[in-house]
């Protein structure tokens, strides 16, 4: 039997209505891509996809990027967020794009995109 938590406890533990869903994203620039192009593309990714959709991106890389996408506020990403990110990466010439399934970012963080 699962333990019953009050609202304060659920908020602290990110459970039930406070659960946060996100997804991992990996992508790669073509070998030899100039650093200026990488910077410009990542800036556009944030300005055109992440911020307008109320998302947050925590990631890093040079030619190969990997990171976590979640909502800026407490909440749950959905399939439309995954598809929007994936489509933008595809239409902007990035390679080896991987977008994970949605997962609980506090309790189910995967070690890699599956």
Swiss-Prot record:
One cellular component term from this protein's GO annotations in UniProt: cytosol
Signal peptide residue numbers: none
Pfam families referenced in this protein's UniProt entry, alphabetically: YggL_50S_bp
Family, similarity comment: To E.coli YggL.
Name of protein: Uncharacterized protein HI_0341
Lineage: Bacteria, Pseudomonadati, Pseudomonadota, Gammaproteobacteria, Pasteurellales
């Amino acid at each position: 039997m699962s333990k019953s938590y009050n609202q304060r406890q659920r908020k602290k533990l990110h459970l039930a209505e406070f659960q946060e869903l996100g997804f991992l994203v990996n992508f790669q620039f073509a070998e030899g891509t100039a650093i200026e192009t990488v910077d410009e593309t990542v800036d556009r990714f944030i300005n055109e996809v992440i911020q307008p959709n109320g998302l947050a991106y925590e990631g890093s890389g040079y030619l190969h990027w990997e990171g976590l996408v979640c909502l800026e506020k407490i909440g749950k990403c959905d399939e439309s967020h995954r598809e929007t990110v994936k489509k933008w990466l595809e239409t902007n010439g990035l390679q080896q794009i991987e977008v994970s399934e949605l997962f609980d970012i506090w309790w189910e963080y995967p070690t890699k995109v599956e």
